[in-house]
Amino acid sequence: MFKLTHVWAIAAICLSSVQTIDAQHYDSFKIHSHNDYEQKSPFWNAYANGLTSIEVDVFLKDKTLYATHAESEIIPNNTIRSLYLDPLSREVKAGKITDDIQLLIDLKSEAESTLKEIVNVLKKYPELTSSPNIRFVISGNRPAPENYNNYPEYIMFDWQDPDHRPGSNWDKVALVSVNFADYSVWNGLGRLTAEDKKSVVSVIEKAHSTGKPFRFWGAPDTKSAWKAFTELGVDYINTDQPAASSAYLRSLKERTFTNNGYSTPYIPDFEHDGKDQEIRNVILLIGDGFGLTQLSAAVFANNNTATITQLKSIGLMKTQSADDFTTDSAAAGTALATGEKTNNRAIGTGTEGQPLENITEFLDKHGFVSGIITTDRITGATPSAFYAHQKERSESARIARDLLRSKISLLIGGGKNDFEAVVKQSGFTVADQVKDITASTGEKVCWFMAPNEVPSVLKGRKNDLAQATGYGLEYLDNKQKPFFLMIEGAQIDWGGHANNTGMIITEAIDFDKAVTEAIRFADTHKNTLVIITADHETSGFSIPQGNIHTSFIEGSFTTHDHTGVMVPVFAYGPHSGTFTGVYENTEIFHKIITLLGFNEK
């Protein structure tokens, strides 16, 4: 059962919590189910979806109150009692209605006789009329305003003339409703024109100046309209789509975000970008779940800029796994790390379960040192694909034990409580602070970002990823050997799974800070190639609205899972143009090996 709060409905039953949207300081909103009796499940559809108002048209015939717009449309069993009063009565008797509810009844037959019969019928429902949480609002054909006080206290009225008040009977008015078409021709797509917005805002403010809630009827019924009316302070959002409008408005808090943590973009010098010269170091940055829209949202929320978007060599990568159209991170990470497609859930193993040589193992034979940095646990699917060989990604203990024979010299991520022992057993020195990495004299060094799961930026993680990238590059460079470094911004994906726009944006901006460190390093180490991509896209993310000037983004989602869309690839440094075009995720491995001048396995 949905929690119910302050709901005064329109020809409707208002049942649901007053919902507030923190993003952009949205006011509380209520949703009105227009002509609810025409729904496949009158009352129940709106009630189950937590709507705050349910409209029922009523026509009196032969002492029966039919739920209908006109006498010619009467359906014998569809009465106000069967469709609305009886269900509401059952909910009250069951103790499920504890907050304010309003039933607004739109009279389609003659006002006074119809209202008289409504009062007679309501006498049979004392549990409703005596409830401090329930009152009834009369709309449509109404008696003269001077007669409002002749009706019981629980009977209120809908007022439709914002320019005048009914004198001493104003306390019997529950809300103000007007026809949207009298103020605008907007169809709910795009946005209101400046002139129309001025007219719309004027009538809303006029109604609010009386202390009454406000509703438009005949209003556009789209997502853009629902959001616009919420922002403008319309108290009841009019809809013929109870489920869709409720889902949209209820999720606005998680789908909208105003950024206040920025990344200063680094402008590359491009001196060695695209040049035909030797590559000594390779930095591969993987934004988990980092599709083009995730990147766009981060850019728009970051003063319309990012280090990533300074780059000139851009490609698109396909992400399908061997056994599924939509990959998981294990199969995607394996494809990037080994150049081979595999089944979902497999870590560094082929479709038959056989171990696949990964890039860190391959390069070790050619004198390279390698490192892994992630904001996931060190056994996360993407990072482990670069050192482990297990058929099942959930086998964290076995994955960690693969560190014993790995070719990794630098390891940074979460999970200290679970994995510190095996890390030390694998020959790693564990640094207390990230800055201690560069002073380490050990052959292998590890720093744990967190005892368990690495916290998100929204939950307090600071500049750990960028700092780890900077110190990690310094550590590898000090070894005086060519190196390969994989850096993962893992929690962009987590924001997608949670359908949380703010988490996507903050994690993507944080990832861009790591990109800045990599590009800056490449500018001072001319033989360094930087590649930035994703393992897959997460959530089917889109951006229906936003404001670049205020760093505000509204996101929308088609799923809580991964999708099969192509993801962007950016490259910087010698031979960066090799990464333009459209290709499979396995090609990242092959392109790197070829550019380094090695024959493959």
Q: Which residue stretches match the model-derived regions?
A:
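Loop/turn elements at helix/coil->beta-strand transitions in domains of secreted/extracellular proteins
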Residues: 26-29, 50, 98-102, 130-135, ...
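Active-site regions of oxyanion-processing enzymes, predominantly non-cytosolic
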Residues: 433, 437-448, 468-490
